[in-house]
Amino acid sequence: MLFLSALLACGPACFSQQVEKFPLGDYVELTDTKPHDGEEVWSKMTAPVRFCWGTTDVRYKKLNVPDVKATGTLRLKAWKGERVNAQAVLWTQKELEGAEIAVSELKNGSSVIPASAVNTYFVRYVMTDELNKDGSGGCGPRENKAEWDSSMVADVLDIVRVREVQARSTQPVWLNVWVPADARPGKYKGTLTVSGKNFEAMKLPFEIEVVNRTLPEPQKWAFHLDLWQNPYAVARYYQVPLWSKEHFDAMRPIMKMLANVGQRAITASIMHKPWAGQTEDHYDSMIFRMKKLDGTWVYDYTVFDKWVEFMMNEVGIKDLISCYTMIPWALSFDYFDQATNRVQFIKAAPGEEAYAEYWGTFLKDFSRHLREKGWFEKTAISMDERPMEAMREAIKVIKAADPEFKITLAGNYHEEIQGDLYYLSIPYGNQFLEEVKAERERKGQISTVYTCCTEAFPNTFTFSEPAEAAWTVLHAVAGGYDGYLRWAVNSWPMDPLRDSRFRTWAAGDTYSIYPGPRSSIRFERLVEGLQDCEKIHILREELAAKGANGKLKKLNAKLSEFTPEGWIKTNKKSPAKMVSEMNALLNEM
């Protein structure tokens, strides 16, 4: 407790990097300097203000007249318990004062989906950049932003309810309906309305056909979702002391967004800078280590326990505690040395005696603590993208400390160690051999796929096509993986609401949830894909049990397109079209 008490007593003064209060409410976007439609284009509008249904597949440009055609009623299909999205587009010649959105309840005879199940958002614009110049992906230094083609793109789903809309601009509106699990099947009709102080209210009708199928609660989905959390970014952005009540209050709604989409793993850091401070807000150790005068070690788990208890009991993410890492990028390990009364570092590589002593002593005590808390079976010692020989040496130390410890790796496949890995996530474009995957499944091991800055496609950069988020997780099912891992969901850059660019990777690589919390087009499309993955799981089991081989073959054939080789066979069909076709097939079965 001494470690935490000292930290909290220090308060905001401990956080010298916190020099600016960043916006949580309304804010001013950066200026878009790209060429855009001028007065001569905007003057051709048939009415000074227009409001029409668009598509969730497009990021509409703020300063261009959108390519949208007037339609009647928007029609969507949904399972009970499913979330469905739509995007409307408001564009105007004149400034709109006090624009706000309203939505009615949805009615199907005497049955109602309440307005409380419907969320609406103004879509906001954030600065983005581009792929590497050779189109190969988004990895590599980007310190000089002037070297990269930057522009403003639609992505943020804002929580501000009333907005001023500038003249000659486009303002998208996002609609999200979470159909109640007990909704009666049928067609529900509702209305989306935009109104303001200086323009007439405009209405768009929509209809959701609820089919007689039910999605389970997200935590019961078969898909293993692992999006890494960064509590340190929240403390910096919200200007609150680490691990204070205010910090947990700020994190709660952010982390609940993850629980509500089936997140399985808690990201815990068990050493100082496990990734060498690669993010704007580096991870620190949640476990305090002290070497006493007599050379023995003591460990304080106060912060680790608070974080895990919060995530399990208040947020509802309970399946796995991923503890990073024993093999950091910089092989330097911190501890407080009582003899010198200061923090010291041990430099040691896997295979060296100093490494084995530092980690072996800790892991034995950590095992004891986890067993006392009842968390041992849920906890894994986790590594990512580390060389095989280093992994082998680390595994030896782990097994010597407690042979029952679970071990995870996100990195290249190595046959020599895969059997030791309870959870192995391999890069996009790599596959598990069929017999290896079957054996891992038999042993209760988890086998997933991950993407990062490497992939030009599919990805969830802020300039990526929105449908790529759904495509990515559908690929996980198509490739026979158990789920999907991405290394960051809220490792925010300095000013994430206005500028998604980062010094090391393509814009948006480090996050898909914004402060507020605010969702994003990317995150909502990811949810769409996750729901389709669960539908596929349900339908495959059902069709196999019924012996409906024709329908099963049709489903698997469509799903096979969501692999690198399958996509090529489609002549690289647009991800938007592929996801739409898959969604339609799942809803008709």
What do the PLM-derived regions correspond to, one by one?
Residues S332-Y335, V343, K347-Y413, Y481, ...:
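Catalytic domains of carbohydrate-active enzymes that cleave complex glycans
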Residues S322, K406-T408, T448:
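Structural detector of well-ordered beta-strand residues that form the stable sheet scaffold
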Residues W148-D149, L157, W178, Y188-G196, ...:
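Aromatic-lined carbohydrate-binding surfaces of glycoside hydrolases
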Residues Y423-W505:
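Catalytic-core region of carbohydrate-active enzymes that cleave or remodel glycosidic bonds
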Residues T408-Q431:
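Aromatic- and acid-rich polysaccharide-binding/catalytic face
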Residues M1-V19:
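Bacterial Sec-dependent N-terminal signal peptides
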Residues K80, R184, D249-A250, T302-V303, ...:
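Short, glycine/acidic-rich beta->alpha junctions
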Residues C14-A276, F376, K572-M589:
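Mature N-terminal, pre-catalytic/accessory segment of carbohydrate-active enzymes
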